[in-house]
Curated annotation (Swiss-Prot):
HAMAP family listed in its UniProt record: QueF_type2
GO molecular function: preQ1 synthase activity
Superkingdom: Bacteria
4Fe-4S as UniProt keyword: no
Listed GO biological process terms: queuosine biosynthetic process; tRNA modification
Residues reported to bind substrate: 80-82, 222-223
Active site per the UniProt annotation: 183, 190
The protein's role, per its UniProt record: Catalyzes the NADPH-dependent reduction of 7-cyano-7-deazaguanine (preQ0) to 7-aminomethyl-7-deazaguanine (preQ1).
Catalyzed reactions per annotation: 7-aminomethyl-7-carbaguanine + 2 NADP(+) = 7-cyano-7-deazaguanine + 2 NADPH + 3 H(+)
Protein name: NADPH-dependent 7-cyano-7-deazaguanine reductase
E.C. numbers: 1.7.1.13
A GO CC term attached to the entry: cytoplasm
Coiled coil: none
Amino acid sequence: MNPEHSPLGKATVYAAQYDASLLFPIPRAGAREQLGITSALPFFGTDIWNAYELSWLNARGKPQVAIATFYVPAESPNIVESKSFKLYLGSFAQSKFDSVDAVRDVLKRDVSAACGASVSVQLVSPHDFAKLEMDELDGLSLDRLDLDTDVYEPDPSLLSAADGENEAPVEETLVSDLLRSNCPVTGQPDWGSVQIHYVGPQIDHAGLLRYIISFRNHTGFHEQCVERIFLDILHACKPVKLAVYARYTRRGGLDINPFRTNYNQPMPDNARTARQ
């Protein structure tokens, strides 16, 4: 299914009852082919979706609320278009479920079917809300650099690294809050923070910041932007190990946080940043 056929940018009709058919899958293959990925993926990882506007009725008709987190594997053939996800979650509001577990099971079944892979689902009930953490991405801030730039479309030529043959490899974690891209259907801006961890030739910090800023006028879904960043750094700077994690601010009650890596490491924390 193409994004142009999704609910984005169209008049919205809110479902009165639970409706799994509202989920609109978008194949990852098209965007990945544009990046030169036609066979085995050069990374693995997860898309972490947090849903803050989930409510349903219990068996006696009393409203219940929860925060839902979905872990979508990067190898899934599809992503779910975000507005369709919002409408799908909204369809739970006037539907009765016997338990929290029943809601979780339905969410897992439906979203897994739309993505074409097993999706993990966690629900946090109100009595656990106080346990949820808020934190910023850890690392050395690239935003400390005072520099000029005038490139606002992705340009991997901005990236460079030290000569790997003549200098020892380094291990660094770098972060920036200056990531912005735009929805390919509506043109609405998507604001994010990005964390880049690598082992290899030292990456030029100023060039990396200019590269991140260069996404400012780019149109692409969150997941596609992170994969482009990962591949451009991998090809231009040739790190031995690389991980890219972005946390985007929420829209429509959802935030999307893609993570891509080429080496085994723990799942990143799902702590909200201040802007989220």
